[in-house]
């Protein structure tokens, strides 16, 4: 009986945690690490698809290998255990947000995204109630409201602002798409071996890319990562120049355009220098081509003729001498 009652609660909490992560803003105050995103992905896959039975992707798919390793590391963990681990990881993330992000810098709707978790997870970490009352008009835990409805206040509390369109994910995504909870992280993960690990530019809701677009972006990022060391000297600004964090799509496009322009200028400069070197007059010694020597041993023409003709001259003189003696 206890198990039958526990499974629906665990699944309900799991679905609520998935919904919260799916709705987190991309440009929020908290940026999860790569390890956290991979853990969320692995727990989700284990909870929805079971143990990893698919073969490991090839070397040409580094993102798939990262995700496969994270999923495969869970072994034969049951789906209920994976859901529980997912919820536990969600609690750790919520506590980390409370501990690391100053409450004075948190947007008013920041903790509004976690409100569904407060309704189904009683021990979900939450900020001080005074802060919740001040920024969101939150009065009491939603669990108590389910038991006993609270009276309406004299003035309606301030509703949490809905996420902006640019930070909100498409709602037509099915749950299976969300299982790849590091889809939007793929360009950043490709750069992990090249750049030092820094907080990701995008937040956890990174599921709006399809399989084809994801593969194209991975291939483009692989080429960009392979040529980064070659273009660093000629690049107008390196990736580390953007505030010490990874670049967003627009910043990456601007940086790539600048890099290509710098490379083109470098190639033009090299070509111009080569033309200048080719057009310079060569020194006299180099201009004077080595003179062909038709005569052997470097002998002059008269000397060579003398060596050729002297036997005949001697023979003729000898004959003249003999003729005169007779």
Swiss-Prot record:
<feature type="binding site">
    <location>
        <begin position="41"/>
        <end position="45"/>
    </location>
    <ligand>
        <name>an acyl-CoA</name>
    </ligand>
</feature>
<feature type="binding site">
    <location>
        <begin position="21"/>
        <end position="30"/>
    </location>
    <ligand>
        <name>an acyl-CoA</name>
    </ligand>
</feature>
<feature type="region of interest" description="Disordered">
    <location>
        <begin position="223"/>
        <end position="248"/>
    </location>
</feature>
<dbReference type="InterPro" id="IPR022408">
    <property type="entry name" value="Acyl-CoA-binding_prot_CS"/>
</dbReference>
<keyword id="KW-0597">Phosphoprotein</keyword>
<dbReference type="GO" id="GO:0006631">
    <property type="term" value="P:fatty acid metabolic process"/>
</dbReference>
<dbReference type="Pfam" id="PF00887">
    <property type="entry name" value="ACBP"/>
</dbReference>
<feature type="domain" description="ACB">
    <location>
        <begin position="10"/>
        <end position="99"/>
    </location>
</feature>
<feature type="binding site">
    <location>
        <position position="67"/>
    </location>
    <ligand>
        <name>an acyl-CoA</name>
    </ligand>
</feature>
<dbReference type="InterPro" id="IPR035984">
    <property type="entry name" value="Acyl-CoA-binding_sf"/>
</dbReference>
<dbReference type="InterPro" id="IPR014352">
    <property type="entry name" value="FERM/acyl-CoA-bd_prot_sf"/>
</dbReference>
<dbReference type="GO" id="GO:0000062">
    <property type="term" value="F:fatty-acyl-CoA binding"/>
</dbReference>
<feature type="binding site">
    <location>
        <position position="86"/>
    </location>
    <ligand>
        <name>an acyl-CoA</name>
    </ligand>
</feature>
<comment type="function">
    <text>Binds medium- and long-chain acyl-CoA esters and may function as an intracellular carrier of acyl-CoA esters.</text>
</comment>
<keyword id="KW-0446">Lipid-binding</keyword>
<protein>
    <recommendedName>
        <fullName>Acyl-CoA-binding domain-containing protein 4</fullName>
    </recommendedName>
</protein>
<feature type="region of interest" description="Disordered">
    <location>
        <begin position="147"/>
        <end position="170"/>
    </location>
</feature>
<dbReference type="GO" id="GO:0005737">
    <property type="term" value="C:cytoplasm"/>
</dbReference>
<dbReference type="InterPro" id="IPR000582">
    <property type="entry name" value="Acyl-CoA-binding_protein"/>
</dbReference>
<feature type="modified residue" description="Phosphoserine">
    <location>
        <position position="164"/>
    </location>
</feature>
